[in-house]
């Protein structure tokens, strides 16, 4: 019993560990002979090669079921969101205030518009084609170069007086500002049955305000998005796609008064009454022009 409880010295423990690492009597290293180390190494190499192959095969089969031309993630909204340029956000949404006589208050707004429209220059649209059809541009095959689909041109000059080409101030200098409305992209979305969607901007009724109806000039005419820009087939299928735009030039905004402007998309398949998403099918912003 006393022998079992005998404590080993440090040198004895080191000698046992050295003997475990290499036993000259049996030729074992770490408890195994060289041949057994070779066999166990080959076993693990073969095991992990097979496991890696099975994993790669599973990934390959999975990738064959995924359409590379369909986005991995899509919103649950059935109608596209609507965005505005210039976009200046305040504490409670879009708020645009400026003074006609002080160009420092609206220079940044026009700069935002010019920067945004730079992507709609003829040079930026060189890979797109001219479209004149008044119907949807369906493309079942990949007829464009590099296995892609064609995209229709939309250039800034289509916005005419709101293009920044004839009036670099976009109407802000004279108190008749231009605002650009854009619908967000939804893959294979068709906004209407046969008539093109159009933009309609109005003053939003506010208590204690008696406003005359808002007068608007729309560009392109009637504020419509041509149907040949739809459907959108995704970024990989249409890498050069440009969203169509509508510019609204507000003609009779009262000065020194904050008004709320509502611009909504009128189309068969676009809704704008979702209480949970203020930008679905419409955009609302506050505007105050000082003089």
Swiss-Prot record:
Family annotation (NCBIfam families): Na_K_ATPase_bet
Species, as recorded: Oryctolagus cuniculus (Rabbit)
Glycosylation sites: 99, 103, 130, 146, 161, 193, 222
Impact when changing residue 222 to Q: Impairs targeting to the plasma membrane. Loss of pump ATPase activity
Record bears the keyword Chloroplast: no
Post-translational modification: N-glycosylation is necessary for assembly and functional expression of the pump at the plasma membrane.
Membrane topology: Single-pass type II membrane protein
Listed GO biological process terms: cell adhesion; intracellular potassium ion homeostasis; intracellular sodium ion homeostasis; pH reduction; potassium ion import across plasma membrane; regulation of proton transport; sodium ion export across plasma membrane
Sequence ranges on the Cytoplasmic membrane side: 1-36
Protein name: Potassium-transporting ATPase subunit beta
Record annotation: effect of changing residue 21 to S: Has no effect on pump ATPase activity
Outcome, altering residue 161 to Q: Loss of pump ATPase activity
Role this protein plays: The beta subunit of the gastric H(+)/K(+) ATPase pump which transports H(+) ions in exchange for K(+) ions across the apical membrane of parietal cells. Plays a structural and regulatory role in the assembly and membrane targeting of a functionally active pump. Within a transport cycle, the transfer of a H(+) ion across the membrane is coupled to ATP hydrolysis and is associated with a transient phosphorylation of the alpha subunit that shifts the pump conformation from inward-facing (E1) to outward-facing state (E2).
Result of changing residue 131 to S: Impairs the assembly of an active pump and its targeting to the plasma membrane
Effect listed in the UniProt record for changing residue 162 to S: Impairs the assembly of an active pump and its targeting to the plasma membrane
TM helices/strands, residue ranges: 37-57
Gene: ATP4B
Family membership: Belongs to the X(+)/potassium ATPases subunit beta family.
Domain free text: The C-terminal lobe folds into an immunoglobulin-like domain and mediates cell adhesion properties.
